[in-house]
Amino acid sequence: MTTCKDCAFFFSIPEDADDFEKSKGDCVTQKDDEKGRYWLSKPVFENDQCCGAFHKR
C-alpha cells in the first residue's frame, strides 16, 4: 500500500506554522486551464492512503 508520504505532491507542514500537526502535510497539484496555471492544495497526513494523483518521489 502506498501512502501520501511517498508521493511527490506531499509537502510537510513546518513546525512553526499555525496549522502544524505531527505527520500533517499538504497535497499540492498543478493544474492548467485556458486562463493559465494554478495549484490546488488539500490537507493530508503522511499515512493516508494515496489518491489517483499519486506520483512516486
Curated annotation (Swiss-Prot):
The residue range of the signal peptide is: none
Part of which pathway?
Xenobiotic degradation; toluene degradation
Mind telling me what this protein is named?
Benzylsuccinate synthase gamma subunit
Describe its partners and assembly state: Heterohexamer composed of 2 alpha subunits, 2 beta subunits and 2 gamma subunits.
Any inhibitors or activators noted? Activated by the benzylsuccinate synthase activating enzyme BssD. Rapidly inactivated by oxygen.
Any one GO MF term held by the record is:
benzylsuccinate synthase activity
Q: State what this protein does.
A: Catalyzes the addition of fumarate to the methyl group of toluene, leading to the formation of benzylsuccinate.
Q: Which conditions up-regulate this protein? A: Induced by toluene, probably via the TdiR/TdiS two-component regulatory system.
